[in-house]
């Protein structure tokens, strides 16, 4: 870069001697600086070619994934995944034996579909794609980072998209939440991702008796009640209170057994009340009295 600066100054001044001393700049560097390199769709294709190449090293594939994810943070580039037929090779990586690649494929997918209904629908139309993400999220033997990224991706796929939530529901997606929350070996980060997915579901599901029955059938109400304890992660407690608050606001009624556990739970978390969301706490506290 310093050499390019000297050359630029000498060239502007018309100093032949100084230009000779500076030498010719690197053509590739000039391309990068003045926009003469490949356009972003081409870079996306190149990155996916590396990712899909069985001869490429893991390190090179991870670098290519990193570059690809930075590119698709742009909405137009995210939508170009479909236009350039790159969803299929990306979805194929979800079956790769290397967990780092599976995690990156999920991360890229989650980023591409975030607040982007066009890319959400593009992904979901591929046969078995949503089911693969659900399977990766639910697998207890799966790599922890892969599971965390899978929950992130599911949340971003479902958010503000009723059609994809309906597909998720048809695949019994809600049943993957309680096992994570009950798993003593699951990280708090994974449990927070599971609660984030649950919160996202509440924004698109029909809040009716059938949905409430599903929450009970999949042990979600019972399991979340167990987090109302001061020794639990405060962020998890907050997530649970928000979950209950949203249910209460749409007319959900706790059973007698659930209400008794709720009363005990609210009493248990009184010592940390000041560190919790005030509105959610008071809503749940009022019902528990």
Swiss-Prot record:
GO terms for molecular function: adenyl-nucleotide exchange factor activity. SUPFAM superfamilies: ARM repeat. InterPro entries: ARM-like, ARM-type_fold, Hsp70_NEF-Inhibitors, Nucleotide_exch_fac_Fes1. It holds the Pfam family Fes1. ARM repeats lie at residues 13-56, 75-114, 118-159, 162-203, 209-249. Keywords: Cytoplasm, Repeat, Translation regulation. Gene3D superfamilies: Leucine-rich Repeat Variant. It is found in: Cytoplasm. GO terms for biological process: regulation of translation. GO terms for cellular component: endoplasmic reticulum. Functions as a nucleotide exchange factor (NEF) for Hsp70 chaperones which accelerates the release of ADP. Required for fully efficient Hsp70-mediated folding of proteins. Belongs to the FES1 family. PANTHER family: HSP70-BINDING PROTEIN 1, PROTEIN FOLDING REGULATOR. This is Hsp70 nucleotide exchange factor FES1. It comes from Kluyveromyces lactis (strain ATCC 8585 / CBS 2359 / DSM 70799 / NBRC 1267 / NRRL Y-1140 / WM37).
């Amino acid at each position: 870069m310093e050499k390019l600066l000297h050359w630029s100054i000498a060239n502007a001044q018309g100093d032949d001697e100084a230009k000779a001393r500076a030498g010719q700049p690197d053509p590739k560097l000039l391309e990068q600086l003045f926009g003469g390199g490949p356009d972003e769709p081409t870079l996306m294709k190149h990155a996916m070619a590396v990712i899909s190449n069985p001869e490429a090293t893991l390190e090179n594939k991870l670098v290519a994934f990193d570059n690809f994810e930075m590119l698709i943070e742009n909405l137009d580039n995210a939508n170009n995944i479909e236009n350039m037929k790159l969803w299929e090779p990306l979805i194929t990586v979800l079956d790769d034996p290397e967990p780092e690649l599976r995690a990156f494929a999920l991360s890229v997918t989650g980023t591409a579909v975030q607040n982007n209904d066009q890319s959400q629908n593009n992904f979901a139309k591929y046969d078995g794609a949503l089911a693969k993400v659900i399977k990766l999220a639910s697998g207890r033997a799966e790599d922890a980072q892969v599971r965390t990224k899978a929950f992130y991706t599911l949340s971003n796929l479902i958010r503000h998209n009723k059609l994809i939530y309906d597909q998720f529901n048809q695949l019994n997606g809600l049943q993957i939440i309680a096992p994570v929350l009950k798993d003593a070996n699951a990280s708090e980060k994974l449990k927070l991702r599971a609660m984030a997915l649950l919160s996202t579901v509440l924004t698109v599901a029909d809040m009716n008796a059938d949905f409430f029955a599903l929450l009970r059938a999949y042990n979600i109400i019972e399991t979340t009640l167990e987090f109302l304890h001061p020794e639990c992660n405060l962020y998890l407690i907050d997530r649970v209170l928000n979950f209950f608050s949203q249910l209460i606001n749409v007319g959900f009624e706790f059973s007698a057994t659930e209400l008794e556990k709720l009363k005990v739970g609210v009493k248990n978390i009184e010592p940390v009340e000041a560190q919790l969301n005030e509105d959610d706490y008071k809503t749940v506290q009022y019902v528990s009295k």
